[in-house]
Amino acid sequence: MPKIIEAIYENGVFKPLQKVDLKEGERIKLRIEEGILDVIKKYQGKFKLTEKDIEKFLEERR
């Protein structure tokens, strides 16, 4: 069954931010997705959005 966990990438290694139920050496597949804030930063300046617009957008998705 697929699970979604957050991880941080440090020194060439993905480190989960929560406990995972895996055996040592077990192989898994990772799907890398950008967080919404990463996407906003990436396109910042390409669209005319105010901070208020961004806050409203994020609030609607919570």
Swiss-Prot record:
Keyword Nucleus: no
UniProt keyword Transferase, yes or no: no
Keywords: Toxin-antitoxin system
Pfam family, one: AF2212-like
Top-rank taxon: Archaea
InterPro entries: AF2212-like (IPR008203), AF2212-like_dom_sf (IPR024069)
Role according to the record: Possibly the antitoxin component of a type II toxin-antitoxin (TA) system.
Protein family: Belongs to the UPF0165 family.
Protein name, UniProt field: Putative antitoxin AF_1095
Species in which this protein is naturally found: Archaeoglobus fulgidus (strain ATCC 49558 / DSM 4304 / JCM 9628 / NBRC 100126 / VC-16)
